Regions:
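Strongly charged
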Residues: 2-33, 37, 44-156
């Protein structure tokens, strides 16, 4: 076992417009090939579209969508005595955010539509209402954890 201490967690700086670390992390997830300004333009356009469509604060809709898509449980493969069990484990907040944001972005990519801004807008609106592909993925994950609840004592 390593005797070195764990490195300090690097918290990304908050974004300049909403002063939110979550927004900054989400923009970094949207970013492709290092084009951060494009990712920021996509995200802020999406938030403006949401605000125009719903007459609500776009950032609140975004936060609600993330909350609805964040899983509380997931399964992890654990090998015991020659057989592999799917062991349900709790999801830590950072991992939950990472899963939810990647599911929302993947669902938006697979959606039909003209531009990515439009696709992401529709996916965030669906996720904030509790439906959409990202929320379905969360429900599938919870269903899998519930089905394998018998193996919870193998937790590590």
């Amino acid at each position: 076992m390593s005797r070195r201490s764990k490195p300090e967690r690097r918290i990304p700086s908050a974004d300049p417009i909403y002063n939110s670390v979550d927004v900054s992390k989400f923009i970094n997830r949207v970013m492709r090939r290092g084009k951060k300004s494009l990712a920021e333009r996509i995200f802020y356009s999406t938030i403006n579209n949401i605000a125009e469509r719903t007459n609500e604060n776009g950032l609140e809709v975004f936060q609600k969508a993330l909350t609805n898509a964040t899983p509380l449980l997931e399964v992890k493969a654990r090998r015991i005595g020659g057989s592999t069990y799917q062991v349900p484990i709790d999801v830590k907040p950072d991992r939950g955010f990472a899963l939810a944001s990647s599911w929302i972005i993947a669902a938006a990519k697979n959606r039909g539509g003209k531009s990515f801004v439009e696709k992401l807008t529709n996916e965030l609106l669906d996720a904030s209402n509790g439906n959409g592909a990202a929320c379905k993925k969360r429900e599938d994950t919870h269903r899998m954890a519930e089905a394998n609840k018998a193996f919870a004592h193998y937790r590590y």
